[in-house]
Amino acid sequence: YPHILVHNNDKSVILDKIEKEEWARLIFENTKKRLAVYVERHKTNPNWILDRYLMNRVPGKRYTHFVSDRGGTKLVEYKGDAPVPTIRVSSHKRTPITPEGKPYVAPKIEDVIPQDTSMTMNLLNPSTKQFERVDPQQYVSKINREINELAYEAAVLYWLTGDESYARFAADILDQWVNAAVWQYPIEGPGRVGYLDIQTLGDEKSKPLILAYDFLYPYLQEKGYSLKNYDTVFERVAWTLSFRGFATNNWFAAESSTLVAAALSLSDKAKRDYYLGFYLKNDTVSNGCGQLSLPSAAKIWFTPDGHWKEPGGYHN
């Protein structure tokens, strides 16, 4: 470890580049600067960041099963009760929109209520400049993703610097996440729904933590963090992205890096090869959903000169 994006023998090359290349030094220094307040606070108040992770915290409502509507647009039912808080799943595939037709302003991590148990949030209406109580919808995943990305960046900085304050910050977030997600199951619904997000596309928001695990594994072992639940959670991510998500547009391609990261993180070689096979050679498409392997994707979705067969303005 690490073994997905880099290996340990790459570290000296990266550090040399940081020392000699201005662009690399700026990325390194700006990342440290961005993380400094979180990592420093974590030394004396680790619950600050953990309590702002959006979870189902109320006993009796620590949901384990989620059901979407027939179109996979929104959640319509919550079931089960875990012995610990579970990860909140975005209730809708879209961001919340004001009556004036504009997106509400998403709160910063600092503005999230610690250990919030409500299913709604006070969000700023940019038109009226007033806060309104609404369902945060996709902002649930957005907020958690921002915390996931902080953990990933801290894990990389730990690997590069050896500073254990980065490792502890990232490891505590990762530990809370995996021990919550292990109680949860892929959403019940059509082929577009995901595991920890209403859409399979949204499950890529877990990728930063999967990659953080790769950088943190020796630290997690050394400090006695439980590792027993990681394989279960990583396999659920890999399974979801292998057999769900649209294969009739760019979804399968957008999801593939998360699928590969989850598969490469599995400790069982047979399972690792099984899920990697769906990226490398075996299609799983059924009723328009699943994973197209690289050979099929190249044949179906790329022009002879290597262009993706969707219009350039698709995302505008």
Segment roles from a protein language model:
Residues 261-316:
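A compositional/structural signature marking long, glycine- and acidic/polar-rich segments
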